[in-house]
């Protein structure tokens, strides 16, 4: 028989917000007597944008911008109803994207 598991994937641009959110989730899960694994860091995705500096000529003069998307995974094994309720009521920062799979 397979045990029930919750997998939480977090994405964000800032690592400090991401780690604080992971710590809040792990703290609430351990407070309700659930076993957690993580935060497991996934590869950071870099997007680089190349833009011409001048509007008309000078193609050799370019500027590069990049965004980095950091990802973490947290697994919660054998969650109970209080764990799920406390995770739903948890308040996380606005810059963090959360995907929850049961």
Swiss-Prot record:
<keyword id="KW-0689">Ribosomal protein</keyword>
<dbReference type="InterPro" id="IPR027486">
    <property type="entry name" value="Ribosomal_uS10_dom"/>
</dbReference>
<dbReference type="GO" id="GO:0006412">
    <property type="term" value="P:translation"/>
</dbReference>
<dbReference type="InterPro" id="IPR001848">
    <property type="entry name" value="Ribosomal_uS10"/>
</dbReference>
<comment type="subunit">
    <text>Part of the 30S ribosomal subunit.</text>
</comment>
<keyword id="KW-0150">Chloroplast</keyword>
<comment type="function">
    <text>Involved in the binding of tRNA to the ribosomes.</text>
</comment>
<dbReference type="GO" id="GO:0009507">
    <property type="term" value="C:chloroplast"/>
</dbReference>
<dbReference type="GO" id="GO:1990904">
    <property type="term" value="C:ribonucleoprotein complex"/>
</dbReference>
<dbReference type="InterPro" id="IPR018268">
    <property type="entry name" value="Ribosomal_uS10_CS"/>
</dbReference>
<dbReference type="GO" id="GO:0005840">
    <property type="term" value="C:ribosome"/>
</dbReference>
<keyword id="KW-0687">Ribonucleoprotein</keyword>
<comment type="similarity">
    <text>Belongs to the universal ribosomal protein uS10 family.</text>
</comment>
<protein>
    <recommendedName>
        <fullName>Small ribosomal subunit protein uS10c</fullName>
    </recommendedName>
</protein>
<dbReference type="GO" id="GO:0003735">
    <property type="term" value="F:structural constituent of ribosome"/>
</dbReference>
<dbReference type="GO" id="GO:0000049">
    <property type="term" value="F:tRNA binding"/>
</dbReference>
<keyword id="KW-0934">Plastid</keyword>
<dbReference type="InterPro" id="IPR036838">
    <property type="entry name" value="Ribosomal_uS10_dom_sf"/>
</dbReference>
<dbReference type="Pfam" id="PF00338">
    <property type="entry name" value="Ribosomal_S10"/>
</dbReference>
């Amino acid at each position: 028989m397979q045990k029930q598991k919750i997998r939480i994937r977090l994405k964000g641009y800032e690592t400090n917000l991401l780690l604080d959110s992971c710590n809040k989730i792990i703290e609430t899960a351990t407070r309700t007597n659930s076993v957690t694994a993580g935060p497991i860091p996934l590869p950071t995705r870099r997007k680089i944008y190349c833009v011409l500096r001048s509007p008309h000529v000078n193609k050799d003069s370019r500027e590069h911008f990049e965004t980095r998307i950091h990802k973490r995974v947290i697994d919660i094994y054998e969650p109970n109803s209080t764990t799920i309720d406390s995770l739903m009521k948890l308040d996380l920062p606005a810059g963090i994207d959360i995907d929850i799979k049961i």
